[in-house]
């Protein structure tokens, strides 16, 4: 868990101190880029709005970490649930990484107060970029991009939980 938080924070601090907001470098062709963006809200840039919305989101994240921690302790003592301990621990590490951004980055980087920091995102994988045909039933002639979200190490830590859930369910 500590490794995920450390890698997450080191990568964010590097991007924050070596890139300009919006700066992008191509790592592998056009499909893997480092693109510096900051997220004011949560997944996919969804915001609760205003000063109190940001505070609510930050306190929700902190409460979620407490609940997830308690959940991990309970799962650790149940042999049927132990296979979920590692994935949930990675989720916990990811949540802690994003909480650090939300609580401290506003003050550390001098752009806002405590609990109003923005989450640093940098990994961008636009695997498919095309224009939809004019006769396409929805969004005819519009630009289409898959995979559009920009994310960070903390965000990526959720993937093992999804994989473990699929493996157990036999999907």
What are these regions (language model features)?
Residues 1-171:
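Alpha-helical transmembrane bundles and membrane-interface segments of multipass inner-membrane proteins
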